[in-house]
């Protein structure tokens, strides 16, 4: 939570309507790039409904931070993201930090685990979430801090919740995850409100910042891979240290 506050306490709501919108941010909305008009010049007036929708079909009032904007594009954000990369021996510059090839969500998790006191027998740091997912799935470590639990299930504070991304967004089973080859995203669960049907989880490089995701659960109060197509969750890394 302390690290999240250093980034400005950004919140992203992941709803059952397939939305994923920033609801709280220390920064104003990024200025939209002008859209081309029919004659090839930049349009200055209001665009059509199609222009006002992002790539996921969400309306213009859904705040998002594209690459090159948001907290990671500030000097402070760059310095903090560079700290996370240092945990795996890398030193990207501030331009690289804002590029997809240097996505820093996995090294954020690695940094947090080391700060929490986990050693190499419990959790191995990695540049890819799939590295430590496979470690936990295959029982690689002598004293593992986590084991894999398939969904649907109810997360608990201290667990990691993970989803596939890109070409592997819709994986159906944790056995399909390849070590260092499957693009993924994982968040750290910090609170579960069963009455409201919401899980709160903190992750890095979410809308170009360390953000708290407020994730709506299914009708049974569980996390699953179907309730929100923005992040079709695949598994829980269950915390065995609690």
State what each model feature region is.
Residues 121-208:
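...with weaker cross-activation on analogous glycine-rich loops/strands in unrelated enzymes
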């Amino acid at each position: 939570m302390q690290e999240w506050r250093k980034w400005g306490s950004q919140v992203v709501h992941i709803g059952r309507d397939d939305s994923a919108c920033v609801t709280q941010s220390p920064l104003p909305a990024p200025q939209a790039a002008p859209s081309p008009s029919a004659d090839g010049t930049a349009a200055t007036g209001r665009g059509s409904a199609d222009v006002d929708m992002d790539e996921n079909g969400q309306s213009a009032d859904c705040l998002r931070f594209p690459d090159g904007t948001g907290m990671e594009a500030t000097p402070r954000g760059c310095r903090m993201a560079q700290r996370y990369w240092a945990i795996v021996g890398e030193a990207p510059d501030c331009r690289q930090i804002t590029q997809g090839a240097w996505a820093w969500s996995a090294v954020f998790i690695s940094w947090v685990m080391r700060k929490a006191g986990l050693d190499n027998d419990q959790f191995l740091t990695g540049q890819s979430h799939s590295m430590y997912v496979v470690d936990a799935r295959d029982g690689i470590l002598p004293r593992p801090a986590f084991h894999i639990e398939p969904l649907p299930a109810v997360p608990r504070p201290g667990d990691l919740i993970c989803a596939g991304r890109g070409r592997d967004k819709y994986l159906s089973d944790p056995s399909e995850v390849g070590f260092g080859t499957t693009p993924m995203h994982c968040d750290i669960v910090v609170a579960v409100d069963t009455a409201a049907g919401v899980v709160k989880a903190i992750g890095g490089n979410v809308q170009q910042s360390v953000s708290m995701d407020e994730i709506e659960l299914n009708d049974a109060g569980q996390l699953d891979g179907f309730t929100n197509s923005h992040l079709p969750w695949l598994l829980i890394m269950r915390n065995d240290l609690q």
